[in-house]
């Protein structure tokens, strides 16, 4: 082995099987493709996922206390850009836009993706700050699978788990790389391509405006007020300001750490 830079750590840990984290609050259902997740305990059965405060799903899970994990088959790979590249904040009903349907879990009523190969209903039990993300710990209350799961194991003759290998690097268009172990079929899908591109660009601009507002503010309260005004100007929910400010503060701390480690 040879030593490489820490900036490559995330890519070293791929490929992984991502989950779609779904949640609902006040009638708004959202979801995001998440690669950073794991089982954390047998008894009680606890699952964990890392989510950044800026993500709309973060707000839904925080405020509802109920969420779900959904595992997808590779046949749904074309739905991934809606789930991983664009925010529910900017594309309301993005799961429906992806051509997917929502059903309700039998125990918690959590929103589940009807086309998923497996789903787990989770009750939020704790949130642990971990740098620029928070780790959400959820106790599993119910699990559902298609018939490809039998005898206590997935049948890979019929189930092709969606796996994620990471993003290609700039310059040039960025692609997310997905694959499945059956035949190692591979797909490269442009990041936020086509009609999703303007929404991804809008998200980048919004994050930039929020970061500038936070830098220009002398207190957190002042920053939240400034971001509320920005959200109102953009036709977005001003109540998201707290989460966006928290994310900007975490990013700033992360930038400082990187600067210190490289100096």
Swiss-Prot record:
Any one Gene Ontology molecular-function term assigned to this protein's record: FMN binding
Matching entries from Gene3D superfamilies are given as:
Electron Transport, Fmn-binding Protein, Chain A
The Swiss-Prot or TrEMBL record lists the needed cofactor(s) as: FMN
Q: List, alphabetically, the SUPFAM superfamilies matched.
A: FMN-binding split barrel
Q: Can the keyword Ribonucleoprotein be found in this entry's annotation?
A: no
Q: Which UniProt keywords apply?
A: Flavoprotein, FMN
- Pfam families per UniProt: Flavin_Reduct
Q: Which domain of life is it from?
A: Archaea
Q: Which family is it part of? A: Belongs to the flavoredoxin family.
What is the name of the protein in this document? Uncharacterized protein APE_2580
